[in-house]
């Protein structure tokens, strides 16, 4: 999601003629390093999420309510890496927008939509995990196929309507005279918000889903620890392999959820705080800081497949099938990705 820095000195702005690029003092070496780092993040985002998309779509063993939510989120993160990040990279490195005003509005709208869609998916997955861990007896009757479809529809439709409606109507920049002058002067493309819409965006699109996620994952963590302690206190002669496996899974679930929550907050909290606070500081935050915050938010989509790779054995097994070409064999869709279950 884009942010903007509005410079105070617009005296050099041409009143007539072609728009120019904002001045930049970055050396070739600095730009090269930036391109390499951002390209690396893009490649991981695209191919990491593509592995998740192929795996869950192909292997029947992965067809579950939770994984369909993960599949949809991976699609969101893949689109962010494939459609949004390349243009954002050029804009961030060159400090200029070369792709026209019309595409600027589409890019800003789609960028905002995908960023919010990814956040809403994380919240939906938290709800799914809450019922699976804290109310397992009600899970199958609550998280039905119909419920998953409704969650997915909301995760995509609400951000799309909000993002495209806000950007195309230009309500987010209403009353911002300095922004209008900047756009008229330079080849510049960034998403910014006035005080009203900055507050609305922070409250509805970050604080609310973030609070829900923190509350849910906190509850899941407590329940998982309680299950682990209960299994640990049982007499040795009543423990079986299944109970030991359950204890291990509970601990792993609590650890994974903590990492997911920590990565989410680390990536998105600074960006949304800038959205909230910068309008009250007369948009004085340096552009290099805002660029860093934008890419930190993008990095959440880069981290999601990495988290799966480290903590979900099925991801590594599916990746092995894809890389080795086993996925092209007949009946490969029925391959067992959970050998420890047998």
Swiss-Prot record:
Membrane topology note: Multi-pass membrane protein
GO molecular function, one term: trace-amine receptor activity
InterPro entries membership: GPCR_Rhodpsn (IPR000276), GPCR_Rhodpsn_7TM (IPR017452), TAAR (IPR050569), TAAR_fam (IPR009132)
Glycosylation (residues): 18, 25
Stated family: Belongs to the G-protein coupled receptor 1 family.
Domain notes: In addition to the well known disulfide bond common to G-protein coupled receptor 1 family, trace amine-associated receptors (TAARs) contain an unique disulfide bond (Cys-21-Cys-185) connecting the N-terminus to the extracellular Loop 2 (ECL2), which is required for agonist-induced receptor activation.
Function: Olfactory receptor activated by several primary trace amines, including isoamylamine. Activated by isoamylamine and cyclohexylamine, but not to the corresponding alcohols, isoamylalcohol and cyclohexanol. This receptor is probably mediated by the G(s)-class of G-proteins which activate adenylate cyclase.
Protein name as annotated: Trace amine-associated receptor 3
Organism listed in the record: Rattus norvegicus
